[in-house]
Amino acid sequence: MNTSDFNFVFLGQSVLRYQVPLDIYDIINHIYETKYPELKPANKQLVGKIEKEHSLFFDGPPNNKMTKHNLLPQNVFQWFHEKFTHYLQWNKVVDYKMHFNSVWVNQMFEHEYNPVHVHQGTLYTGLSSVMILKLPKSFGVEYSAADAPQNGRLQILGSSSGMFANIDYQPDIKERDFYIFPYDMRHTVYPFNGPGMRRTLAANMDVEYNPIRNRGVS
């Protein structure tokens, strides 16, 4: 098939997947494991039905749920900043300001889950993310429809509709995956059964931008 006349144009929101460099991946896991007794619980500001939700970084307004703190080194910040910047550039967003709002880790065990939700930081506009830090050897028995596994899955739900639209994304997640998507893109994590644990990181980057200024940018 000759595709020399092909060009790609899409309407709607996008999810970008990156691979985390091994050094960044190791640093984050090391901080979580060695600093665990010092980590601030993040449960009060999250919707997850998860016991172990802990914050690594917060730079939003002080409130009764969380105060400012940081356990991440500069090279990790720089890597996050580069990836969020790439997302905005790839989506041709212009004239924006970014502010790194928060980073936390969810460590999930059997039957725990994250219901469908969206994110926000200090602003309602911005980018969220999911980084896969650890996975169990198995997500357990699929009690039905084993050919379409759901246990332990991340599902990201798009807001586009109409013929031929991709309305959801359910990747075959692997350790060191890093997914970036807009704050208002709904997503969920299904429970699994059996031994082991599933450790993921979420990071929120506030993005101040003018949607009118960005309308029709190409």
Pin down the residues of each PLM region.
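Hydrophobic residues positioned within well-ordered beta-strands of beta-sheet architectures
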Residues: L16, N101, L127-S129, R199-A203
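Catalytic core of non-heme Fe(II) oxygenases with the double-stranded beta-helix
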Residues: W104-I180, G196-M197, P211-G216
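Short beta->alpha connector loops
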Residues: E110, M185-R186
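Non-heme Fe(II)/2-oxoglutarate
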Residues: M1-D95, H111-N114
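Ligand-binding loop in jelly-roll beta-barrel domains
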Residues: R186-T200
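Short acidic alpha-helical/loop segments enriched in Asp/Glu that coordinate divalent cations
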Residues: V93-H99, V141-S144
